[in-house]
């Protein structure tokens, strides 16, 4: 991976900032400032260009707007890795792809087990399937040499496939009623972006101009607007280390790590425990998410990756053992950012009263998975 040292350092900082932002949000949500916090996120913001006007609460500007930039960065990273990184060597694809798939199936099955008889609850089946790359790499980096670098690379590859799966899930299962006019405009802007690449336009400002137009069209189409970020990323030229893709990725990475993801965590992680009783923790949605992240992820990833390590001698040269694999499998249960995001999509048009359950399940499941994974890897070394 290019610039691997700076990448992992940045992800470490990002994981720490995410944790701080989430803790602050939880503290505020359980304090007298809770009303102000909720009011702040509900403030409407408007953007007008000519006759076109978009008005949304601040929370949705973050989730639909800023998160599109995050998905743009994800798309750029995936394209880079396919062209000349981890995913460019086809022999490196099978293990992380199958591991990520198993890490998706088991959490989904656990969620379905608890919510099969509740049609609305069941719409959140994908919530525990996600892995937060910033948090996971942040936790792993705190362990230093206890985790072989090759295992960190593998974790990154698994997270990339996890992101690809999340993109497909959002596109297929969390798309509203479609507007053919807006979709047609989105297709036109996509073709323009492809044309800019083909005719060797290398001005980021031109791509971003039509990228914003594409985002607006996708926003109005019924497809979730964040997917515009992925489409834009796939059209960005990539011709080597100093390419437009590399420059845009470098420029966005700091904004995403230091602003967008912490702001998303602050806006979405504010779960209030005021007035909660023990029965809330046995709610089917909470159990499905919490156990899906903690139990489902570790089962899926440990069984699949453990098989390759134990029986196919995968990573044998790096002396990776099953205890390290189990620790990594646990840490992959930190779904946080993407789990909260999918949760907001799953229930936003059905039952917003379920969002506190989503937050409780994601926070508890991610915390327990991350802590136990950290302890397993730390104690194994000792």
Swiss-Prot record:
A Gene Ontology cellular component where this protein is annotated is: plasma membrane
Q: Which GO terms describe its molecular function?
A: sodium:proton antiporter activity
Pfam families referenced in this protein's UniProt entry, alphabetically: Na_H_antiport_1 (PF06965)
Which GO BP terms, alphabetically? regulation of pH
Residues that span the membrane, as ranges: 13-33, 58-78, 94-114, 124-144, 153-173, 179-199, 204-224, 256-276, 285-305, 325-345, 357-377
Question: Which parts of the chain are coiled coil?
Answer: none
State the disulfide connectivity. Answer: none
The keyword Membrane appears for this protein: yes
Chief localization class?
membrane
Which keywords belong to this entry?
A: Antiport, Cell inner membrane, Cell membrane, Ion transport, Membrane, Sodium, Sodium transport, Transmembrane, Transmembrane helix, Transport
Which chemical reaction does it catalyze?
Answer: Na(+)(in) + 2 H(+)(out) = Na(+)(out) + 2 H(+)(in)
Function text: Na(+)/H(+) antiporter that extrudes sodium in exchange for external protons.
The entry sums up its family as follows: Belongs to the NhaA Na(+)/H(+) (TC 2.A.33) antiporter family.
HAMAP family per record: NhaA (MF_01844)
Q: What is this protein called?
A: Na(+)/H(+) antiporter NhaA
Organism taxonomic ancestry: Bacteria, Pseudomonadati, Pseudomonadota, Gammaproteobacteria, Legionellales
Encoding gene (name): nhaA
């Amino acid at each position: 991976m290019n610039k691997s040292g700076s990448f992992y350092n940045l992800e470490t900082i990002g994981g720490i900032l995410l944790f701080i932002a989430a803790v602050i949000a939880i503290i505020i949500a359980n304090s007298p400032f809770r009303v102000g916090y909720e009011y702040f996120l509900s403030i409407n913001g408007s953007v007008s260009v000519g006759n076109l006007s978009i008005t949304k609460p601040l929370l949705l500007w973050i989730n639909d707007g800023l998160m599109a930039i995050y998905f743009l960065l994800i798309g750029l990273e995936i394209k880079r890795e396919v062209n000349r990184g981890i995913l460019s060597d086809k022999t490196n694809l099978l293990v992380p792809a199958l591991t990520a798939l198993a890490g998706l199936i088991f959490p989904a099955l656990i969620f379905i087990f608890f919510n099969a008889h509740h049609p609305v609850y069941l719409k959140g089946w994908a919530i525990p399937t996600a892995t937060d790359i910033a948090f996971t790499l942040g936790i792993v980096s705190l362990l230093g040499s206890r985790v072989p670098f090759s295992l960190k690379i593998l974790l990154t590859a698994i997270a990339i496939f996890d992101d690809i799966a999340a993109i497909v899930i959002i596109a297929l299962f969390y798309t509203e009623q479609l507007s053919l006019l807006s979709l047609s405009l989105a297709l036109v802007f996509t073709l323009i972006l492809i044309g800019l690449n083909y005719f060797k336009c290398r001005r980021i400002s031109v791509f971003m101009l039509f990228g914003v137009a594409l985002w607006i069209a996708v926003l109005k189409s019924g497809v979730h607007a964040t997917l515009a970020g992925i489409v834009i990323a796939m059209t960005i030229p990539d011709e080597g280390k100093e390419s437009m893709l590399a420059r845009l990725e470098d420029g966005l990475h700091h904004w995403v790590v230091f602003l967008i993801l912490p702001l998303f965590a602050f806006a979405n992680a504010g779960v209030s425990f005021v007035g909660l009783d023990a029965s809330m923790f046995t709610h089917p949605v909470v159990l499905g998410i919490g156990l899906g992240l903690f139990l489902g992820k570790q089962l899926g990833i440990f069984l699949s990756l453990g098989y390759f390590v134990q029986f196919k001698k995968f990573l044998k040269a790096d002396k990776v053992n099953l205890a390290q694999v189990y620790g990594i499998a646990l840490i992959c249960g930190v779904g946080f950012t993407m789990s909260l995001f999918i949760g907001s999509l799953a229930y936003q048009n059905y039952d917003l009263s379920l969002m506190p359950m989503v937050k409780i399940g994601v926070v508890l499941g991610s915390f327990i998975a991350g802590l136990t994974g950290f302890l397993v890897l730390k104690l194994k070394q000792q």
